[in-house]
Amino acid sequence: MPPSELHLSTEEFDELTPLLYDSGAAGLGWWRVRETDLRETPSGELLHQAFRLLALQANIHQTKIQKLFRLMRAEGVEPILLKGWAVARLYPQPALRPYGDYDLFVRPHDYVVAHRVIESEAARGCWVDLHSRIDELADTSAEDLFARSRLVECGNEQVRVPGAEDHFALLAIHLLKHGAWRPTWLCDLGLLLESMSGDFDWNLCLGKNKRRANWVLAAVGLAHDLVGADMADKEIAARAREIPAWLARSVLKEWETPFAIDQPPMSHRAPMRSYLRHPRGFFSDLAHRWPNPILATVSVKGKFNRLPRLPYQLGNCFLRAGALIIPKRAAD
């Protein structure tokens, strides 16, 4: 489907460009304007240059991923690559979906060996986030994840990625868990929804847990409302459109400053424990720690509905306060 006509003035484009550039969406921004007159503007050229750089980085990432899989397999470890390249490969150009590290999932009994591999000199420069469990898919066993995974081409190497249903659920819950502050996360879901195969098993994706199903459907609803994602399964689409109005408003509020530096813990001025000895600045920093309502809902295992979010936000604060106090008491 051709893109819709773009109604954006040069001034509006100039205002939007820093948000695109700093939020990781510069490549997507260029892709959208590359066939319009905006490509000739200074902002258009800035996004074009960013796209070229992202294309180079995508090639470097692919080379490193191939190396990591060779190193792991040489030690008898078979990993699954999550997020990052596993999603970027589905875009028209890998440069449209930048990422910084490589999330690798391994069976628990392989973790020690896998950790030794990524700490080795041979893996130097490969930034790996190694997992032996996936919190977002806590109700799914490692063996089921591997049984449903599949091998795909990454250059001259076969790379293992999650099954479509597992990966969609992971990406959806990960987005909500982190407050949906990064726009590209929702673009990922939109891409997956619109390119979904006819045999995609929604029952498997939603799982048997009603809370997990609620979370995944909430993310689907956001993808429909905010990035215009369409989908073939009309029953799921109807269920997803029942998301509460506050949810989309909260995401748009986050997108006003979609930068990693504005997210916890980087947005915190000092570790909370430091205020126990030096309380100056405590109250001003406390305001920066008030939780995003989306993040708060997931953190206390709540549901996305029309009820007020204040109880969930207070619950999140109590959880964090408990984590702060209990280790201190144990040390005493």
Report each predicted region and the residues it spans.
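Conserved NTP-donor binding/palm subdomain of two-metal-ion nucleotidyltransferases/polymerases, i.e.
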Residues: M1-G100, V106-D332
